[in-house]
């Protein structure tokens, strides 16, 4: 009943309710713009692979009960693992990186896992970089008596006063959901906190959202507490969740001030109210309203002090860095709202950042950006992506940039993984060996295709005629026979072909290129098949050199040897 009431009070959407129950919905994004496999036909790029996160979850959540036997279960697991790790595309190092990244994310605290899911790091190094930046942001605002970094989030409990309730932060719905549905239970009564039973219900009439927020924060349990940890983590998710990697460095200073203000106020309020909380427990006659009044007074003084510092910083921006390093008090924030209803600079416009109001009223929250929204748009073709890294990779298609160059032959590539695969041509490295015949390959994808010769596996079947193929590219080419599609058109004469290889051969008619040369007579040809036919002419000429008389003499010689 408490869950239903909490959802009703805060207007929690069904999607947020699913996130509360641990159900993670991952959208399949078509963001890989270039095929990682070396030597595949260009037609394979027409169907980019889905998000690996979908296949990873399928692999991890696979149950034995869904199969008819152990062999089928094992084969299904192999198939799911292959779809997730993609050994035909990824190298050994990349597969190892995926496994280490998954384990690394699993050992992180729940809040950091949720935070990192917004960025979907591709490697462990990228995840560590994000966490180190977060730790630097927090450690830069060190508070006496507390620790640095994420450990700062796990200290202390703050009391919930009526004044605090009426002057609560301007949380959006995602932050409300995090407060109510946190997987960890609130701590029990301590000398640093007041029980929920000591907090009277608000009597004032105001915005219905005010009352909904207040009722959501109060629980029936007399020992329930609102922890500074949940508040801090919500602020981190709010500040960081809607910003991409490119914007993070630009907003670091303002975030440090914003987060530092919250932590500093939480520490000072906790220390200031510690003695009064102990007095409540021991039966002191001090009323809860007096404590709330003192807290409100101290809180108002801090806000006035922050407003004066902001004005000085706006007049003298050069003094900002020095003041942040020297001032022992709570840091200031440009985006903090000094007065009721006034919005910070980042709230004007696109809604990519968030500022929090410390006023007595709840202000309207700017429009939220969904977590799966494709906010990064290509100016050339208009295609959108969820991550800036995917947009950068996509732009290589338009710019033709190939920053990775081979030191041996000078050939350039747009992706580093393709360069690694190419360099094996020069080194002769063939790390992938067949267990059946011992044949080795430089690419894992070639080994997988080779193993189908031994197994006779043809997993790709045509829906029209039922013909099966061992490679998906062969099926794609075959299906064009039924559809009549000819996507490859010659720019010279306009003739179209259903295969890229046919177009390459056709272009040699216009360029007069003849790369296949006979070693006997020096004659050149445009196709290798034509050169093979030409070799038969020389073979017949050699056979005609042996006359019947010479053959009889050679036969007599063999008989004499016997």
Swiss-Prot record:
<feature type="cross-link" description="Glycyl lysine isopeptide (Lys-Gly) (interchain with G-Cter in SUMO2)">
    <location>
        <position position="374"/>
    </location>
</feature>
<feature type="zinc finger region" description="C2H2-type 6">
    <location>
        <begin position="516"/>
        <end position="538"/>
    </location>
</feature>
<feature type="zinc finger region" description="C2H2-type 1">
    <location>
        <begin position="376"/>
        <end position="398"/>
    </location>
</feature>
<feature type="cross-link" description="Glycyl lysine isopeptide (Lys-Gly) (interchain with G-Cter in SUMO2)">
    <location>
        <position position="411"/>
    </location>
</feature>
<dbReference type="GO" id="GO:0008270">
    <property type="term" value="F:zinc ion binding"/>
</dbReference>
<keyword id="KW-0597">Phosphoprotein</keyword>
<dbReference type="Pfam" id="PF01352">
    <property type="entry name" value="KRAB"/>
</dbReference>
<feature type="zinc finger region" description="C2H2-type 3">
    <location>
        <begin position="432"/>
        <end position="454"/>
    </location>
</feature>
<feature type="zinc finger region" description="C2H2-type 5">
    <location>
        <begin position="488"/>
        <end position="510"/>
    </location>
</feature>
<feature type="region of interest" description="Disordered">
    <location>
        <begin position="1"/>
        <end position="23"/>
    </location>
</feature>
<comment type="similarity">
    <text>Belongs to the krueppel C2H2-type zinc-finger protein family.</text>
</comment>
<dbReference type="InterPro" id="IPR001909">
    <property type="entry name" value="KRAB"/>
</dbReference>
<feature type="compositionally biased region" description="Polar residues">
    <location>
        <begin position="261"/>
        <end position="276"/>
    </location>
</feature>
<feature type="cross-link" description="Glycyl lysine isopeptide (Lys-Gly) (interchain with G-Cter in SUMO2)">
    <location>
        <position position="27"/>
    </location>
</feature>
<feature type="cross-link" description="Glycyl lysine isopeptide (Lys-Gly) (interchain with G-Cter in SUMO2)">
    <location>
        <position position="180"/>
    </location>
</feature>
<dbReference type="GO" id="GO:0006357">
    <property type="term" value="P:regulation of transcription by RNA polymerase II"/>
</dbReference>
<keyword id="KW-0832">Ubl conjugation</keyword>
<keyword id="KW-0677">Repeat</keyword>
<feature type="cross-link" description="Glycyl lysine isopeptide (Lys-Gly) (interchain with G-Cter in SUMO2)">
    <location>
        <position position="337"/>
    </location>
</feature>
<feature type="domain" description="SCAN box">
    <location>
        <begin position="56"/>
        <end position="138"/>
    </location>
</feature>
<keyword id="KW-0804">Transcription</keyword>
<feature type="domain" description="KRAB">
    <location>
        <begin position="226"/>
        <end position="305"/>
    </location>
</feature>
<dbReference type="GO" id="GO:0000978">
    <property type="term" value="F:RNA polymerase II cis-regulatory region sequence-specific DNA binding"/>
</dbReference>
<feature type="cross-link" description="Glycyl lysine isopeptide (Lys-Gly) (interchain with G-Cter in SUMO2)">
    <location>
        <position position="477"/>
    </location>
</feature>
<keyword id="KW-0863">Zinc-finger</keyword>
<feature type="compositionally biased region" description="Polar residues">
    <location>
        <begin position="356"/>
        <end position="366"/>
    </location>
</feature>
<feature type="cross-link" description="Glycyl lysine isopeptide (Lys-Gly) (interchain with G-Cter in SUMO2)">
    <location>
        <position position="278"/>
    </location>
</feature>
<feature type="zinc finger region" description="C2H2-type 4">
    <location>
        <begin position="460"/>
        <end position="482"/>
    </location>
</feature>
<dbReference type="InterPro" id="IPR038269">
    <property type="entry name" value="SCAN_sf"/>
</dbReference>
<protein>
    <recommendedName>
        <fullName>Zinc finger protein with KRAB and SCAN domains 1</fullName>
    </recommendedName>
</protein>
<feature type="cross-link" description="Glycyl lysine isopeptide (Lys-Gly) (interchain with G-Cter in SUMO2)">
    <location>
        <position position="439"/>
    </location>
</feature>
<feature type="region of interest" description="Disordered">
    <location>
        <begin position="31"/>
        <end position="50"/>
    </location>
</feature>
<keyword id="KW-0805">Transcription regulation</keyword>
<feature type="zinc finger region" description="C2H2-type 2">
    <location>
        <begin position="404"/>
        <end position="426"/>
    </location>
</feature>
<feature type="compositionally biased region" description="Basic residues">
    <location>
        <begin position="178"/>
        <end position="187"/>
    </location>
</feature>
<dbReference type="InterPro" id="IPR003309">
    <property type="entry name" value="SCAN_dom"/>
</dbReference>
<dbReference type="InterPro" id="IPR036236">
    <property type="entry name" value="Znf_C2H2_sf"/>
</dbReference>
<keyword id="KW-0479">Metal-binding</keyword>
<feature type="compositionally biased region" description="Basic and acidic residues">
    <location>
        <begin position="277"/>
        <end position="287"/>
    </location>
</feature>
<keyword id="KW-0862">Zinc</keyword>
<feature type="cross-link" description="Glycyl lysine isopeptide (Lys-Gly) (interchain with G-Cter in SUMO2)">
    <location>
        <position position="302"/>
    </location>
</feature>
<feature type="region of interest" description="Disordered">
    <location>
        <begin position="164"/>
        <end position="187"/>
    </location>
</feature>
